[in-house]
Amino acid sequence: MTEAKELLQDERFLKIQELNSAEPSKRHSVTYDNVILPQESVEVSPRSSTTSLEEPATTTATGVAVAAAAAAAEKKKKKKGEDGDDEQDEQAEEKYPVDPRMQKYLSHLKSKSRTRVHRKDASKYVSFFGDVSFDPRPTLLDSAVNVPFQTTFKGPVLEKQLKGLQQTKKGEVAAAAATAATAATAAAAPPGKKLESNFSGIYVFAWMFMGWIAFRSCMDYYVSHEGGFASMEIVQYMTSDLFTIALLDLALFLSTFFVVFVHWLVKLGFIRWKWTGFVAVSLFELCFIPVSFPVYVYYFHFSWVTRIFLFLHSVVLLMKAHSFAFYNGYLWDIKNELEFSSNKLNKFKESLSPETKDILQKSCDFCLFELNYQTKDNDFPNNISCSNYFMFCMFPVLVYQINYPRTSHIRWRYVLEKFCAIMGTIFLMMVTAQIFMHPVAMRCIEYHDTPSFGGWVPAVKQWLFLLFEMIPGFSVLYMLTFYMIWDALLNCVAELTRFADRYFYGDWWNCVSFEEFSRIWNVPVHKFLLRHVYHSSMGALHFSKAQATLFTFLLSAVFHEIAMFAIFKEVRGYLFLFQLSQFAWTALSNTKFLRSRPQLSNVVFTFGVCTGPSMIMTLYLTL
């Protein structure tokens, strides 16, 4: 009885009944719903045409139909050699049914599988987090200058090396045929041995030189302003409205905890990241700068120093919030994929085709690999907490991950050293800005406000004179700013938080192109752009490498121009154009002429570093 009901619900069986009925009236004797049910593999066995007395008349019709189906099956067996391929396809569809939702999911996994394995070795997975790494390493100046000076400095070493080589030479038996010149050359520097020296003394001399210049400048200012430093414009800029600035900065920081709240809701199961969480975080990020920017630029009458500080710090907070949100959002997607694929494998293991099993198994393997990429003790989603986000915000890094390399303890002497470096560098920056930069800036503003009546030739000459006057002071200020932020400040924060990776910058002063400079002069920002802009645009927007590179530079140029707007409250576009001009400089440095002359390339690069920022500042102040 049950088997008969199953046959009456089988669409293919009813089709066979219609086609094999001898009488036209019987071809439509059985009625059934038009709803297409999922096909299942049903074994049809011949049944007796004898009708049971207890069954209704429809059972007799069913028995006749079963016999007809059996006869049709026998015919199919005889034709197996002719249409065997079609029959195998039909049997495969019956044996391994795939619903449309599952088919869409498998297609999605197939498209993603290309980016999840190495191109040369398909057995190795590629993690989304493999583009950025953190390792215990010191900062460049510490490893090359500070640490050797404090631990191994013992005065001049070159003379001692020469004396040692001469003593070694005297102990050897000289060849009779050796000339005096050959002997002298061998004594000075024997083959295979290199004379070594260090420049620790020059490092000390440079800072001493800067200190005496600052001291002399302060004395001159003290005498010329009748014994007071309170009237210094730079001091007033940096010390006004400190309490209001601190409260506003704290409000910006606390507002970024919104991303933690969103992931907390996802963790509790109230919302899903894929739609609700993603949209909520994206809207928050899109509104963060447009809402806060007018507050500290227009509502409060802050100085340009305060405006640029709040803007840059708000951008840092935005990057940290974005990295935290989308790192965990990606792991939510991976976790959901693992659960879905493993459930399908366990539930429909016997009815899935080998190809489907392979796709789902690879999906599970990759998800486990991704979740355990940083540590086998998977902490996700336990890392979603206010304390974890707070510690991430304290670390001198912009790319979030669950674990970072840490030091065993805090070296308080090192903290004091870096704190003194911060204070001393800020003092030098204030003196440089007040003595060397402020007078030139005032003349540039006067040039901007005064119309030129003598023609464009005198105007160009005066502008060039202002530029040449701007270059020395601004170059010194540029170097001091770099040292204060990327070496002194970040190392001090890293030591206080026991953050072990101190690679905040590379040896950018040895660059031979601006392409190298953009990668290594600001490593934290480069890592953020690499993961969350460059690679994310290739994955989400399907950009090519060239398109992703152009998009990254355009986004960076836009934020640089907004920074200039925070200072001058006007859109000029000079810095935006100079940022894009790096493509031309890169193309120039990649020419055969400069590639074969790295020394000349470094000279061209250094010339650009010295003149470029000064030219940009002069343009904004004068035009």
Swiss-Prot record:
Q: Where are the transmembrane segments?
A: 195-215, 242-262, 277-297, 384-404, 422-442, 548-568, 603-623
Q: Name one Pfam family in it.
A: MBOAT
Give any single GO term for biological process. ergosterol metabolic process
The enzyme's main class, written as a single word, is: transferase
- Active-site residues (renumbered): H560
A Gene Ontology term for the protein's cellular component: endoplasmic reticulum membrane
Function according to Swiss-Prot or TrEMBL: Sterol O-acyltransferase that catalyzes the formation of stery esters.
Q: What is this protein called?
A: Sterol O-acyltransferase 1
Q: Which organism is it from?
A: Saccharomyces uvarum (strain ATCC 76518 / CBS 7001 / CLIB 283 / NBRC 10550 / MCYC 623 / NCYC 2669 / NRRL Y-11845)
